[in-house]
């Protein structure tokens, strides 16, 4: 999940992103689920609610351009986006699950004509 695959990861223009948020019938193949190997095919809004889950990061530990936390998967973000900046949001997980529900959200930004633009959302979390 933390491993960026430019050849298969989803890339949307701003207009497409807005359109797909409104059209929940359009489904995308996001990859394979860890553990089961089942293919994940869901609409963008469901993907964002389930996998990005922004509300989990309300009390997150935040770092800028620094990997403070990581799971066992190879992190190639700096190889794919060598000149980009990123913000890492780390949710340590809950006591209820002994921290095994930890997750990391990395927002990657590029500068263009003096403004920063979101170019990638990289999600990492505990998996089996």
Positions of the model-derived regions?
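C-terminal-biased regions
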Residues: 1-128
